[in-house]
């Protein structure tokens, strides 16, 4: 997508990618999107770890060392970003979303745009039990989530922390006694039925009016600690339609969002969670035509009429992550739908 001649670009455009860590491929794809809108823009990365992979990879002028977010007051974070002339901020980690959501309005007054959902929906997506109670009647059934396994009519379970991601503490396919034993290791455990099946992610970009601009589907063919290390895009019109309705039925979602879904052996969809942020395999979505970064910038510049309502996404684009290196290519074979 080229930069239209009528596009009015504020100067300077300096985008900060927070919690950069080792997300080099994501940073590079963000740079591509930004440059399509403004070739003169600068994209910085930031992290509280001065020795992170991102700090070693980026030029020193493009990396900022930050304190831990909880150490900043609202005024201090405004002052920090203003001092570095930041015009846009893109969070990349679950644990920081609440902070940026709570400070979004204050930053907006300083002409700093943040790609983040509203605080109440961030809290909803962080709380798995409340998320289930609020979304179990929507277009796609949420996986049953309970504070006790006795309320679940299954023989095997998944045990997780109620709040946050915590993929490294999850217990999968456990019998009831094993599930209860695993739960003792967690702070606030919740229980879900174990549902065997294929898993996919559905990614979208949601504008400030709550409209979802296209649904990009990708199979999660190899997952390590909750992150896709192998993934490939595919299409299914019925699933895309229902997932679009799902996203649009949750007020307050904004920016890049993704849903994790399991397809059961019977072919029904079970919603696992919604992450209102860029994900670890999002470089694949950005490569396949989900230009969230471009659209975030266009919306912030009151150029929403240039954002396509129904983008065309490329099928068969594949991501492989090995030894921290991400490669993206077009698969020679088109992925089949699950039956």
Model-derived features: positions:
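ATP-binding N-terminal substructure of ATP-dependent carboxylate-amine bond-forming enzymes
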Residues: 1-115
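Residues at the starts of beta-strands that form the adenosine-phosphate
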Residues: 40-42, 211, 268
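Short glycine-rich, flexible loops that bind phosphorylated cofactors or substrates
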Residues: 97-98, 166, 279
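Cysteine/selenocysteine-centered motifs that mediate thiol-based redox chemistry or coordinate metal-sulfur cofactors
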Residues: 304-339
